[in-house]
Amino acid sequence: MSGKGKVIIKLPKTVIPVKHVEPVLIDVDKLLPHEEIVPGRLKDLMEKIRSEGVVDMPIIVTPIPGIDKYLVVDGHHRWAAVKELGYKKVPAIIIDYFDENVKLKTWYPAIIGSINKLLEEIKKEGIRIEECKGKDDVLKDEELGKYAFVIIGKNNECYKIYGSINEQKIVSKILSKLNLEGEYTLVYYGEKDEALRDLEEGKIDYLFLRKPPTKNEVIEIAKRNQVYSPKTTRHILPYIPAITNTPLDKLK
């Protein structure tokens, strides 16, 4: 891995079957997101949907207990694009969120390059940063849950970034901004073990660790009309929904 201004996604090689499930049409206003929308990605998707005249894949949703709403589990930008284009319905697959075959993990950002500018920008936002005394003490999820992020570096560097969801959002925005400015290469890991191994082998320079949210936490965030930063949740379903190409005419 080398170069600046790039984004690399690292996921373990797994075989997940594609399954056809006939989508149902759900009112766009009955859906609650749990992650922020990325404006550039939303714009691109709106253009794609408008030009193709279809929504290629259904979004994944689950009923929210106690209210007449659904949580967007996967497909935030498809939902937002359909809504922005003025359509009233969106094709969806309803799942049992608490089924043990539906897994919830998080993404772990990492950088290849210098961290100095990033730390400066975080401090400018008034976010408290402390050096860790020993990184082994902060690697467990119960310890990670006390901070927005714990950053560990290849030379046994360790920084604790205090805060929670709001601070994670600020740090994530700074990570993306400096990446776009060519300050470093940004890598997102789907598995902590692989990220730690790459750090040990010198393939990345700094790794950002955090506690994965629980399913109940995700639902509560949505119910409070709050959202996590992009690439906070990583949902793993027992299947990949097949392309169904729902025509836009059906969504009016």
Curated annotation (Swiss-Prot):
Task: Write down the chemical reaction(s) this protein catalyses.
Answer: L-serine + ATP = O-phospho-L-serine + ADP + H(+)
Biological process (GO) annotations held by this record are:
chromosome segregation; positive regulation of sporulation resulting in formation of a cellular spore
**Keywords, comma-separated and alphabetical:** ATP-binding, Kinase, Magnesium, Metal-binding, Nucleotide-binding, Transferase
Cofactor binding note from Swiss-Prot or TrEMBL = Maximum activity is observed with Mg(2+), and activity is also detected in the presence of Ca(2+), Zn(2+) or Fe(2+).
Which cellular component terms (GO) are annotated to the entry?
chromosome
Q: What is its EC number?
A: 2.7.1.225
Provide the pH dependence.
Activity levels steadily increase with increases in pH from 6.5 to 11.0.
Lineage: superkingdom: Archaea
Subunit organization: Monomer.
What is the name of the protein in this document?
Answer: ATP-dependent L-serine kinase
Taxonomic source organism = Staphylothermus marinus (strain ATCC 43588 / DSM 3639 / JCM 9404 / F1)
